[in-house]
Amino acid sequence: MIIEHSAEVRGKTPLYRHLYVQVLAAIAAGILLGHFYPDIGTELKPLGDAFIRLVKMIIAPVIFLTVATGIAGMTDLAKVGRVAGKAMIYFLAFSTLALVVGLVVANVVQPGAGMHIDPASLDAKAVATYAEKAHEQSITGFLMNIIPTTLVGAFAEGDILQVLFISVLFGISLAIVGKKAEPVVDFLQALTLPIFRLVAILMKAAPIGAFGAMAFTIGKYGIASIANLAMLIGTFYLTSFLFVFIVLGAVARYNGFSILSLIRYIKEELLLVLGTSSSEAALPGLMNKMEKAGCKRSVVGLVIPTGYSFNLDGTNIYMTLAALFIAQATDTPLSYGDQILLLLVAMLSSKGAAGITGAGFITLAATLSVVPSVPVAGMALILGIDRFMSECRALTNFVGNAVATIVVAKWEGELDQAQLSAALGGEASVEAIPAVVQPAE
């Protein structure tokens, strides 16, 4: 699907009509309201929740149409396996690197040193729910959950990996049938237009959702709660910033594009993630923009939904950094062997808890429960600020998946470099999400 807007028309668009400006203003208004009128702010949570539900409602159709039509158009079905294999290699490499970065930074900065907190004085009940959910997760259970019990159930539940699983199988079956399936493929391609137009309509509510979510966050937790653990928050934000601009920036430069240009290209989606703390809210927009930036639909459809479960750079940085913070704060010594064990467990548990609400915190609980040296009760120290850290996790995860999509597309020879340069340089009308704010009149 292509939604075109000429550069000339876009140049005349008033600033206030751009989605990123509206969302940014809404975030600022939400912070002010939540700070000065916290009681009112906490009552606005339904606005953020309703918007996220609206977007989640459309995620399954977007993934299905993108993946099924993309694979159906492939003449070489072996390419599906190659794309998936290359994506998983990339995900494993950079997820591990993110875990190592968090571990190294925690050892160098030591954000929890000097706190001298007795684990026995902490309220373990506060994190009991997360620990219980963590014990329910396993690698086997996670893999089995990818296969839905019914065809309709995957779409009804909105499980991304289940929908992706069905979409891949259906796309392969369409490709095998060949010409006889062309009417079905044509129908699905035609259905793509109204589905993405619906996404455009839903995105008009993004400022309202961001306003409600931010007002609730500040109203409930307060800006003052940040000051108590400012060292940990600052370390995590700075580490994530450096990971994006140095590590991912180097990957981008090696593959022929600029990380700054990419961030500028997806700024509307990033602000949406910031306002809602949910990367899922921007998934349809990211898939659309990556396709318009020159990545083939088949690659976009496979890499992005899979990356939402397996390519969580921000979450991985958070896990090892937070685990060592708890150890330092509670004066729990960790040998190099303990830290290597922590790293290995985190590599597995980060996959077992993928796709779960509050996955970052639950994954941390799962990791600590297997590494006996670090007290799980220590998670109570960061429970109050986790909401503020989740925004940075989501943003880092989001940028990581955008970079991964372009890189895998280039590896597979499914990237139009000229179209990518035009999109990131703003020289061509390849953006789809601006249509969210300014539909053709």
From Swiss-Prot:
GO terms for biological process: L-aspartate transmembrane transport. GO terms for cellular component: plasma membrane. The keyword Transmembrane helix applies. It is a multi-pass membrane protein. It is found in: Cell inner membrane. Keywords: Cell inner membrane, Cell membrane, Membrane, Plasmid, Symport, Transmembrane, Transmembrane helix, Transport. Residues 50-68, 119-149, 191-209, 261-281, 340-350, 399-405 are periplasmic. The keyword Glycoprotein does not apply. One of its GO terms (molecular function) is succinate transmembrane transporter activity. Belongs to the dicarboxylate/amino acid:cation symporter (DAACS) (TC 2.A.23) family. HAMAP family: C4_dicarb_transport. Responsible for the transport of dicarboxylates such as succinate, fumarate, and malate from the periplasm across the inner membrane. This transport system plays an important role in the energy supply of rhizobium-legume symbionts. PANTHER family: AEROBIC C4-DICARBOXYLATE TRANSPORT PROTEIN, PROTON/GLUTAMATE-ASPARTATE SYMPORTER. This is C4-dicarboxylate transport protein. It comes from Rhizobium meliloti (strain 1021) (Ensifer meliloti).
